[in-house]
A protein has these predicted regions:
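Hydrophobic helix-cap positions at the C-terminus of alpha-helices
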Residues: 127-131, 154-159
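Acidic, metal-binding active-site segment of PIN/NYN-like and related structure-specific nucleases
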Residues: 139-148, 152-155
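Eukaryote-biased recognition of electropositive, low-complexity segments
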Residues: 155-157, 162-199
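Acidic, polar low-complexity linker/tail segments
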Residues: 1-13
């Protein structure tokens, strides 16, 4: 069901799996709300900064490690509207960047017509969690879909305690065999919204 390339891939110790369409929508909502609140234009989110913030929230620390970033998106969408860089094929897929947290390798994965979006997300998550090499998984699903959240909880129930799994959501979720972080903090950082502006 999943792209054969993913099954054969050598996975890094650290993997970020994100529903790119959902993350883009949340970024848009934050831009609209905070522009009104703080009275200034907010630029597109910095993709590298957002990935760094997710990695830090997921427990990554400075070092020379490698992290794979899998952006799952609708086949109909060629780019994210509220991020820079944003084009899945020309600017993100197969690209990498390095900083004090190591190297980040980005893959964009369009949802094929033969599979439902939630099923594909769950398949990728389950496959990544089965890999012995993977030690840390950061998951950004569309948490507005209750059935998907239940299925993620079920999928992660049997994951080895040696793996550190963090699920990012806009509000706290019902607990499970994973840590939780609030997605909004990493997005606000990537959008350049400073804490002092919110006072």
């Amino acid at each position: 069901m999943i792209d054969e390339k993913l099954n054969k891939e050598k996975w890094s110790e650290n993997v970020i799996i994100a529903d790119a369409d959902y993350v883009d929508k949340v970024a848009f909502d934050l831009i609209v709300n905070f522009e009104r609140m703080i009275g200034r234009r907010i630029p597109q989110a910095d993709m590298a900064r957002w990935i760094d913030c997710v990695a830090l929230d997921g427990g990554l620390r400075e070092g020379s490690q490698e992290t794979q970033v899998v952006l799952i998106h609708s086949k109909k969408r060629t780019a994210m509207d509220n991020f820079s860089p944003s084009d899945f094929e020309s600017q993100l897929n197969g690209k990498a960047f390095s900083d004090n947290l190591g190297e980040f390798i980005i893959s964009s994965l369009p949802i094929e017509d033969v599979v439902a979006a939630d099923d594909m997300f769950l398949d990728v998550l389950a496959m990544v969690c089965r890999q012995d090499d993977v030690k840390r998984v950061m998951v950004i699903p569309d948490t507005s879909r209750d059935a998907l959240c239940d299925n993620i909880r079920h999928t992660l129930r049997t994951v080895s305690d040696e793996k550190r799994v963090t699920v990012f959501a806009m509000q706290p979720m019902q607990g499970g065999n994973f840590r939780q972080e609030i997605l909004g903090y990493s997005l606000m950082n990537a959008l350049g919204i400073r804490a002092e502006e919110l006072k």
